[in-house]
Amino acid sequence: IHSFEVENEETGGHMVHFPKSCLHCDDAPCVTVCPTGASYKREEDGIVLVNADTCIGCKLCSWACPYGAREYDEDAGIMKKCTLCVDKIYNPNLPEESRVPACVSTCPVGARSFGDLGDPDSDVSQLVASRGGYDLMPEQECRPTNKYLPPRPKKQGREGRHAPELIPVTDSSAGVIARWVDKFLSA
């Protein structure tokens, strides 16, 4: 998880936390630095991918990516990254509503959306427009295709709310591990 402070004239600064997934930039520096062409951007949809057969694992793409979206696979000796679940989103055997990346379909709070930002009438374009979506780190001039939304207003009555206090396990019937954890945490 990365954390960045984002400044906004209307709301001031706030922290943005996001996973290390590829933003599939329009001007992807990871693509231009790749000496073998293994990092490439698909012309038909703009998805940035890595060809495992031609990647030499030099890690230049990792150094070039300002978002930290590249990972080196020690076992395979190559770079890996988010593929936007390209095999899933274009799978004709899946119903249309299931053709979304795994990160979108499995997000437990529904914080992720997917769609065509090039279509101003799409649900995702409407969401980005209505909530004031923005590019992450625009000063990098990578033009990421993923947009981030400002935090929703806090719900009334939730200010100052904390997680419930955790009570240490002290019951003699507790397992060995629970007693060890309790002893370790209370030290």
Functional labels for PLM-detected ranges:
Residues 1-187:
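Non-ligating segments of multi-cofactor redox enzymes
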